[in-house]
Swiss-Prot record:
This is Profilin-2. Phosphorylated by MAP kinases. Keywords: Actin-binding, Allergen, Cytoplasm, Cytoskeleton, Disulfide bond, Phosphoprotein. Disulfide bonds join C13-C115. Binds to actin and affects the structure of the cytoskeleton. At high concentrations, profilin prevents the polymerization of actin, whereas it enhances it at low concentrations. By binding to PIP2, it inhibits the formation of IP3 and DG. It comes from the Eukaryota. Belongs to the profilin family. A motif (Involved in PIP2 interaction) lies at residues 81-97. The keyword Cytoplasm applies. Multimer. Occurs in many kinds of cells as a complex with monomeric actin in a 1:1 ratio.
C-alpha cells in the first residue's frame, strides 16, 4: 500500500459522518511521505519543534504548536508519543512512530476524540509494522 493510500483511506476516512480537515504522514526529518490535498504548507522548523517536544515533553507548551503557520495551544498528550493541540472549535493530533509523524487536523463537527482515534490507530499500526 502506498503512503498516499494510508492518508486517503485511513486518515481521511469517514468516522460517524465526519472527516479530518487535513492529514499527512511526515518523516521525522520533515520530508513529506504523503498528505491530503489541503494539508497546510509547513516550515521545517515547525517539524523540528514537534520533534523537540517528543524528546523533551513540555517544550512546546509555552510557545504553542505550529503547523503551516497556524498556532495551536498544546493540551494534554502522551509524553514522547502523542502531542495534541487546540485552536477554537478544532485542533490537531500528532502521533510519533519509529520513523514518521502522523498528523491529523480537525474542525467541528469532528471531535478531538475522533481525531485522536483515527491518528493514533494508524500510528500504532505503523509502529507494529516497524515504521
Amino acid at each position: 500500500m502506498s503512503w498516499q493510500a494510508y492518508v486517503d483511506d485511513h486518515l481521511m476516512c469517514e468516522i460517524e459522518g465526519n472527516h479530518l480537515s487535513a492529514a499527512a504522514i511526515i518523516g521525522q526529518d520533515g520530508s513529506v511521505w504523503a498528505q491530503s490535498a489541503n494539508f497546510p504548507q509547513f516550515k521545517s522548523e515547525e517539524i523540528t519543534g514537534i520533534m523537540s517536544d517528543f524528546h523533551e515533553p513540555g517544550t512546546l507548551a509555552p510557545t504553542g504548536l505550529y503547523i503551516g503557520g497556524t498556532k495551536y495551544m498544546v493540551i494534554q498528550g502522551e509524553p514522547g508519543a502523542v502531542i495534541r493541540g487546540k485552536k477554537g472549535p478544532g485542533g490537531v493530533t500528532v502521533k510519533k512512530t519509529n520513523q514518521a509523524l502522523i498528523i491529523g487536523i480537525y474542525d467541528e463537527p469532528m471531535t478531538p476524540g475522533q481525531c485522536n482515534m483515527i491518528v493514533e490507530r494508524l500510528g500504532d499500526y505503523l509502529i507494529d509494522q516497524g515504521y
